[in-house]
Amino acid sequence: MDARALRAALDFGLIETLAAAPAQAAGLDSLGIGPGDVNLCYAWAQNAEISNGQFLPLYFDSWDQVVQATTAFLDANGDPRSAEPSLRGQVALLASMFPTVQDRNWLRLFVQALGDESEHFYHQYWIAQQRARRPVAEAVDSLWQSLRPRFQRFLTNTHQLDGQIVLSLVLGGEGRTLNAAPDHNVMVVTLPASTAAVAEPIYVVAHELVQTIAATAINDNASPAEQRDGVAAGYAPTAAVRGGEMLIQRVAPELGDGFMRFYLSQAGVTPPASGVQAVFTSTFQLPTAIVADLARQINQALGGS
């Protein structure tokens, strides 16, 4: 990740709005959209393809580009061959995320809702917040630039060489990451309200950087029954937290205590005055084999044997 690419959230706050999609989908009265048209919240919760659409903005540079691509996609009825040649790649991307007629109808209504909210409230709010939190963003940038050399070997060995870190107003400990290519990664992390919490985005960066390692550790060590019953999938959030803590302890140990306290707070657990490691480990429990594999892979990525 290139420190120079650290930037504020995408235009119109689209990342924030998509991250809070279930809440946004609930309030569509101003559009004249009734419950008989489509249940946006239910579809978001039930359809994996739709929920993966939260990563859609990471492929674009602006809200206008998202609108252009979705309009072309809907006009083509989801068929890339029916779109203009210059937009076929974008239409194909959308078709992979929203393959059915019902999915396309959901997308049409949702983009309409986002545009309406942006026009009536969110864009001006977003502009004001970017102005108010500029000192925080600058402090985060400075901290990341100072720490990035310590992460460099891990970034290189995990094929996350370059990309952008995007600061978001609404995301907490769970970031959003697109690993399109070794030199094209987009990571969305929290934007704190004050410089007192300047390290929080770095905690989330570490959490996001270990996602692939965490998935490998789970896949290699979960039993067939755990894979079949969905238990293995449930390990993923915890494995990312545990792996992020391991990475932080190796490359920036001075941030280790803060990392654990941050993620305990995110989990609704009040961090103790002392003994935070024990509480952290008991809160984010994993099978021993997965923990050991996480440690092994992180050590290897940092150049260990």
Which residue stretches match the model-derived regions?
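N-terminal low-structure segments adjacent to metalloprotease catalytic domains
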Residues: 1-121
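Active-site recognition of the HExxH zinc-binding catalytic motif
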Residues: 199-224, 238-246
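Active-site scaffold of zinc-dependent metalloenzymes
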Residues: 92, 174-209
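Pan-zinc metallopeptidase signature
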Residues: 256-305
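Auxiliary, metal-adjacent structural segments of Zn-dependent hydrolase domains
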Residues: 122-183, 254
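Soluble non-cytosolic domains of exported or imported proteins
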Residues: 138-145, 200, 234, 238
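Extended, compositionally biased non-globular segments
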Residues: 227-270
